[in-house]
From Swiss-Prot:
Record protein name field: Endo-1,3(4)-beta-glucanase xgeA
Organism: Emericella nidulans (strain FGSC A4 / ATCC 38163 / CBS 112.46 / NRRL 194 / M139) (Aspergillus nidulans)
Molecular function GO labels: endo-1,3(4)-beta-glucanase activity; licheninase activity
GH16 domain span: 33-286
UniProt-listed GO biological process terms: cellulose catabolic process; glucan catabolic process
Polar residues bias (residue ranges): 495-533
Gene3D superfamilies from the UniProt entry: 2.60.120.200
Amino acid sequence: MSSSLMRRVGSLAASAIIFPGIAHAASNYKLKESWEGEKILNHFHFFDNADPTNGFVTYVNQSYAESAGLVKTTDSGSLYLGVDYENVLTVDGPGRESVRIESNEYYDQGLYVVDIQHMPGSICGTWPAFWTVGPDWPTDGEIDIIEGVNKHDANKIVLHTSDTCDVGGGYKMTGDMTSSECGEASGTIGCVVQGKQGSSGDPFNEQGGGVYAMEWQEKYLKIWYFPRSSIPESLTAGTPDVSSFGTPMAHLQGSCNFKERFTHQKLILDTTFCGDWAGGVFGDSGCPVSDPSDPMLSCKNYVAENPAVYKNAYWELNSIKIYQLGGTAEVEGTQSAAAESTAAEATAAETTAAATQTANGGSIEEITTSTHSVTRTKTVSATHSTETAAVTETAAATTAAASVASEVDATNTQPVSKTKSTSYVTSTTTLCPVESSQAAATESVSRTKTTSYVTITTTLCPVESLQTANAVPSAKASTDAAAATTPAAEPHPSNAETPADSKSSADAVTAQATKTTIAVNTPNPATDSASSVPPDSIVYTAPEVTSSSSVPLFTIVSSSSQFVTVPTAAPSSFEPTDAVRDGADSYSTAASPTTPSNPVFTGVGSKVSISASVAIAAFVMLLLVN
């Protein structure tokens, strides 16, 4: 967890302690979906394929259902979903027409509330159900919230899962558990809880219908049934409080992880006839049996020959609502709470000014870039009477190079201001120190005079002082040609976050201002291919740097992406020397641009060794002074 996130969490916790009102019901269910009457169909589609449960039914599409009167809006505004109750059928022909609707979306854990004015009555041959199922059965699970067959008058709640899942934990419920194994190991039975009489069929309708509520969480699943006269006030008000719901009809919790066994459920409502369940137990339900040896055939005969009995085999829905956890309810009374969070994407306004100066035939470009950025601003405020507690956190944006300006302590844990201005001075030629272990180390260089290709990368080094830096010192040459070293301060580690989609201002500066100075001679493939280390007698030149800005100088290190601070000091003065030597043993300082594939200097070393003649070193320092 990031430090900024921990501070935000801590701030919220502190506010909750100081002002208890803002901690009010942080786990309350908040409304996610609300569909009423005919608008329910805006979120469902009609299933018109063969019945997966082998029912004696013909599911029709929406246009046909509407023209046939199987789907309509009632005078009260509720949604009617019925079946054909006019046509006599033949057993060998298509089954009775009906509708099956399925939600367009899949849903996960939450509180599901369906207000039902009427459900299919207790009629032989019927199998109505309101249920959910995942895209991969039984892996994603199935929850039968309302289900009954034939002359049902008590709802049966059934769960189906993969593998084994025992829910016989003895949890308190008003229903009776008749099977505790939900897994496919038990076949297609599933775990079953049978509700009290009056929870479905004709008795349900005689009470004016009611509300079913299902709470689906990681560790358990609870289902309540509320008759029309006993619906909890919190449900009516749209702010459900499950703690006031009382004992559920079913409390299913057991050996399996419900979070894994039930995922991505779509809602389904249908009415089929006969099928595997209703047809299989047709003779056990007190229904007329025409063929004692074949209860399924007896069911089909009854359904085909008695259309009028199915006039009451319809659903009438008032609403379907889905609530989910995660919101904070509004607090009423003398205490009030407000929480606002703003997350601004990294914004940067850059201005660049360039000036060119000429001295001793050389030129230098001074480019100053000012970057202002504000990111990840989080504000949490709470009001209690006339007192106010506010916590504001601002994280300054950083570049992709993980740069830290010298004026800001990267380890500072105090909130910073909303804006931060960082100035960069580029095109500063200097010799950055390198690690002795780096590939470009100069302590053990070859003295082969025939090696003539070397790349000197102009980089930008940070200066700790905020005052004007008129020059950047180079490595001091030793008179005995021994290695000279220039210590470098270690950079402060950066704890600031870099926005994923924000462009690095450091990259932009480097692209515009980085130059290279090359010492060239006839390349020797034999020596060049053997080592990328330059000889120790190369003349390193640097153009004059004149800065009137009170901003730090930086070195942008391409390979290590870190900033290295170079101490400020006045360079020594030397008399100018001849910059060009000719002949087989000579080097030329004629510069030409190049783009090295492997940068020579990384900017993270502790020292660098350069062996050169006194005259050459004097020439270098003279150029720096000028």
